[in-house]
Amino acid sequence: MKIFLKMTVVSLLLLITVSCTEKQAGNSLPRSTPEAEGVSSQAILTFLDAAAANTDTEFQSFMFIRHGKVIAEGWWDPFAPELKHTLYSTSKSFTSTAIGLAISENKISLDDKLISFFPEQLPDTISENLSNVKIRDMLSMSVGQRRESPATGTEWVKDFLSVPVEYEPGTTYRYSSLASYMLSAIVQKVTGEKVIDYLTPRLFVPLGIEGADWETSPEGINTGGWGLRLKTEDLAKFGLLYLRNGKWNGKQILSENWVKEATSFKIHQNPNLTEAQRDSVNDSMQGYCYQFWRARNNSYMANGAYGQFVLIMPEKDAIVVFTAESNDMWGELDMVWKYLYPGIMDEPLPADENKSAELKRRLASLSLPVPPKNSNEAISSLISGKTITLAENQRQIQSMSLKFNDDLCSLSLKTDENEYSLTFAAGKWQLGETNMRGPNLFTRSANNQIGLPPFKIAGAYTWNEDRSLELTLRYIDCMHHQKYIFRFDDNNTALVDIIDSNSLRLRAPSIEGTIQ
């Protein structure tokens, strides 16, 4: 009897383990090899060579999907598959999806007027153009405003409605992240839920997307035009849902009509260009849809600042996903057309074991450069544990302290309101977390990131030949990083430079410090 009970318990445990494993595997896309899905491994290797040589784009993750299967994927260390990533304007396509779902539930229509949703926030005088703005105009970035509301206060909806609508709605393209915010506000108004909460049972759960978060405005509304964080494979699933016309695992979770409507051409970014001129520029001039962009080769995409892309190629039944920090995001897409696209064939290719093995090795060993492991015992022993009191500065940092222990350097920062501790390793990335907000494209984001910390970070340090200490802090659930550069002299003084990777041209002046 005891043996029987023991075997029963073991069997149940095995069943539970298998069930959990199957459930976990069920949340992932199927994997295959490039050649089995009609793609050349050599084409992907050539792309990786070009990515390594590209000085304008720091690739952070990459995923290539063909016929619904992942055929290549890679993360440049310290980025990793399990990490979420700030998407910037790729978020807009998810806001568009929420609008599509709300339309299918008869909560709104494309022709609903903007002013009908916010009667209490309207300006005293409502112009004819403002009164005619429809949801479809906000989706296609053709509200008619010449300038965008700064939204630096606490009433973003009211601020947006106060900006004059100078052009007839639907006639003039003007990119506006605040128009996307207003779409988010509309969804929340008609559903009683934030966009992220509205999407969770309708989109995220069916696709097996877990752990999503989204920045929120001071009004308690998801920012809509930016601020969503998802993993790389989550983006691939989203792209595949659209590639499959809204169907997932045999179930229509998004209207096929909406997919076609949302991804078809609506307005030219520059109507004065000829077709030949548009093709000769880059993918930025192929036309705008409903919070999606048209792209070359009859493709379309969700994209975000600094090179966050979900490129959907229906004619090739393929998707390419990038997360990156790029100063040439359109050049990033050019690499797809130059290296990856020509390698996509109509039929499966013969297996190429050598190239396949080389590709697996390359993808598994991707890494961003780590600062070299250099030391300076003389200076580090003199400053370790001492406080550097800083002069008044834009970052409101009062003091810093450095401590060295073996191959680790700890940096403590004291601001007007908080204290933070960061750890950096020599010759490798030291992983950690912090509540300190990092670089962000939007100045208004200081108000948006409440509730998102702790942020995932990786730190490394080195001593340079000029005897300066350089600390590199990567925010690995974002694309940006910071550098802290310390220069010490013999008079117990220091100069500190703090450089944000997304604002190199706006570099702040050095901060003077006294070592005590």
Predicted regions and their residues:
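A short, well-structured edge-of-sheet supersecondary motif
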Residues: 49-79, 317-320
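Peripheral terminal and inter-domain segments
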Residues: 354-516
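Active-site-proximal alpha-helical segments within enzyme catalytic domains
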Residues: 182-186, 226-247, 259, 308-325, ...
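Active-site helix/loop module of the DD-peptidase/beta-lactamase fold
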Residues: 86, 105-143, 162, 193-226, ...
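Active-site SXXK
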Residues: 68, 85-111, 138, 183-187, ...
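C-terminal motif of bacterial Sec signal peptides marking the signal peptidase cleavage site
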Residues: 18-19
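Active-site Gly/Thr loop motif
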Residues: 260-320
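Structured C-terminal helix/loop/strand segments within mature extracytoplasmic catalytic/sensor domains
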Residues: 304-371
